[in-house]
Amino acid sequence: MSIRYESVENLLTLIKDKKIKPSDVVKDIYDAIEETDPTIKSFLALDKENAIKKAQELDELQAKDQMDGKLFGIPMGIKDNIITNGLETTCASKMLEGFVPIYESTVMEKLHNENAVLIGKLNMDEFAMGGSTETSYFKKTVNPFDHKAVPGGSSGGSAAAVAAGLVPFSLGSDTGGSIRQPAAYCGVVGMKPTYGRVSRFGLVAFASSLDQIGPLTRNVKDNAIVLEAISGADVNDSTSAPVDDVDFTSEIGKDIKGLKVALPKEYLGEGVADDVKEAVQNAVETLKSLGAVVEEVSLPNTKFGIPSYYVIASSEASSNLSRFDGIRYGYHSKEAHSLEELYKMSRSEGFGKEVKRRIFLGTFALSSGYYDAYYKKSQKVRTLIKNDFDKVFENYDVVVGPTAPTTAFNLGEEIDDPLTMYANDLLTTPVNLAGLPGISVPCGQSNGRPIGLQFIGKPFDEKTLYRVAYQYETQYNLHDVYEKL
């Protein structure tokens, strides 16, 4: 296995022991991108000159034994809706093509302070709206396990780049499953932290009450290491939580004997494919063999998650995206002859089909006469979904189930069928609506396409999720999976 598939933990050890220089790691990563990414299409922009310069500076610090930082010399890829100072940030949209920010997002400041090295920006569904990365204005990313399949979305580039060995970790954002679903489709580990665990300052907003940044990696411990680096309260984000405990690695390796695991009957019901059910049931038996107590429970309002989510998320999107007006920044129509035309034409030409669909839906749901029937009712359903989880967590430590109801579908198969596309979020949207942490880990394959297992935890209890996910991972040989790639 080449260094491109080394874990974050192993790379840190190799660098600390001076067996490899940060500049050698960065060179190997760019060589891998040059070789593989013309096919995978995961990157939208590379920051090669600055990355090489930063790596050379880290080489000098390494020589002086001044290797400060939790991620010293580790390459990273960042979803293109996370602001990067001086590097184009487009949200994969024509609307923001050529937009170069003049400030840094909080997560990027933290990662730079930990001496990670930015490799480039990763493809995504436009403004994070989609489940296949096919709504990107620039390119369609493919699944590294099967190039005929989608990588999932909206963080498809983030998942594909990690799976293909193009970066050891990436950041994505998760509004209704946009980290966990592509992680499942691409056979990697994806964590959606508790709402408020990670600062959203510098994340281009889609749905502000749902969005959360999180890491994608090739194993569980790496994921915990990265989340430690990016977590914490932020004065620039009033929704970030003042929670001091950001230690996620100390319980990794501890057994799960006696851990109470809830398996909702709704998560293996109608709409979930047989191959996914079988993989999850096998995973449940593995958890039992490790000493966990697994019992069936009910989350009765699960079926209302998708309609509730799409009304709330689209409503918030219609408000958040109103700032893209063709005047202050972003795409500016050259054909307009009046201010009203400028607004209309810039937005009509700058936004893609899916983004416009959701703006229309959200504007309708918030309009006079329909607000109570749609938006207000959806918020009430959101409370019911949260109450379901609260009740289960009175007696259980974690919830387990599939991440997605199927494996990755083919490119072009669902892009013109929004309802079918939205149905893929059946098992992920309730977690966002309740503000809970959720992690997806690989649990098998069907016809060469990965299957994801989702663990859902109590608020700010990511530590327990990592503990149980790590123990499960020890029974699933990821080395062989990536060696085949």
Swiss-Prot record:
Entries under InterPro entries matching the protein: Amidase, Amidase_CS, Amidase_dom, AS_sf, GatA
The organism's place on the tree of life at top rank: Bacteria
Disulphide connectivity of cysteines: none
Keywords from the UniProt entry: ATP-binding, Ligase, Nucleotide-binding, Protein biosynthesis
Pfam families from the UniProt entry: Amidase (PF01425)
Enzyme class: ligase
Catalytic activity: L-glutamyl-tRNA(Gln) + L-glutamine + ATP + H2O = L-glutaminyl-tRNA(Gln) + L-glutamate + ADP + phosphate + H(+)
Catalytic activity, EC: 6.3.5.7
Cellular component GO terms, alphabetical: glutamyl-tRNA(Gln) amidotransferase complex
Active site: K79 (charge relay system), S154 (charge relay system), S178 (acyl-ester intermediate)
GO biological process: translation
Family classification: Belongs to the amidase family. GatA subfamily.
Assembly notes: Heterotrimer of A, B and C subunits.
UniProt function note: Allows the formation of correctly charged Gln-tRNA(Gln) through the transamidation of misacylated Glu-tRNA(Gln) in organisms which lack glutaminyl-tRNA synthetase. The reaction takes place in the presence of glutamine and ATP through an activated gamma-phospho-Glu-tRNA(Gln).
Annotated protein name in UniProt: Glutamyl-tRNA(Gln) amidotransferase subunit A
Organism, scientific name: Staphylococcus aureus (strain NCTC 8325 / PS 47)
Organism lineage string: Bacteria, Bacillati, Bacillota, Bacilli, Bacillales
